[in-house]
A protein has these predicted regions:
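Nucleotide-sugar donor-binding/catalytic module of glycosyltransferases
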Residues: 1-139
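Membrane-proximal basic amphipathic "stem/tether" segments
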Residues: 147, 151-189
Length: 189
């Protein structure tokens, strides 16, 4: 039944990986952004990447341009650092279960079609970067799946030439992931 079984009084949705964290006051802050702005479908903020022990590796404060970049570049909107309106989530049909890794990118692209994606400069969550996580351990699959999602979201006339930018983007995303994994390994030693 999942989210559809929630009582009607639940107006907002955030989902958090079992090893990720919200920062103190993040939900209150995100709610304050959403509450006065009915046109906003999702609010997102910064996300601190931490290793398995909780040591800081990197701070993603991608800014408001992330909502535009996600259609043609890396997905920089942090899923644990976002809060969405339930009615917007339901309007787009919820998660597309054909995706295993990049379902959040697909979700964010579809949410952007029914409402505004709003950045807040506050750090809202912490994402634990370790090989055991689905996102990190399945990095190659995740990057490939995100490429499929971005290409499908393009106008039909651009899809045939998408490999011109998708190939270098995939390489950069994979290299960035390798660097974070190295930083995480060093922090544990």
């Amino acid at each position: 039944a999942g989210l559809r079984s929630f009582p009607p009084s639940i107006e907002y949705i955030n989902w958090l990986g079992d090893d990720d964290l919200l920062t103190t006051g993040s939900l209150d802050h995100a709610l304050s952004v959403l509450s006065g702005n009915p046109g906003i479908a999702l609010v997102y903020g910064g996300c601190e990447y931490i290793d398995g022990e909780g040591k800081s590796l990197w701070l993603n404060k991608s800014g408001s341009y992330a909502k535009y970049l996600m259609r043609c570049g890396p997905q920089l909107i942090p899923q644990p650092g976002s809060l969405m309106r339930r009615n917007a989530f339901e309007k787009i049909g919820g998660l597309d279960h054909q995706y295993k890794w990049a379902f959040d990118l697909d979700l964010f692209i579809r949410l952007s079609r029914v409402g505004k994606l709003q950045f807040t400069p506050r750090t809202l969550a912490k994402f634990r970067w370790h090989d055991g996580s689905l996102s990190v351990g399945g990095r190659n699959g995740s990057v490939a799946e995100a490429s499929v999602i971005r290409t499908a979201a393009l106008p039909i006339m651009l899809r045939a030439i998408a490999p011109l930018w998708e190939t270098p983007i995939r390489k950069v995303i994979l290299r960035t992931g390798e660097k974070l994994s190295l930083r995480s390994a060093r922090a544990q030693n």
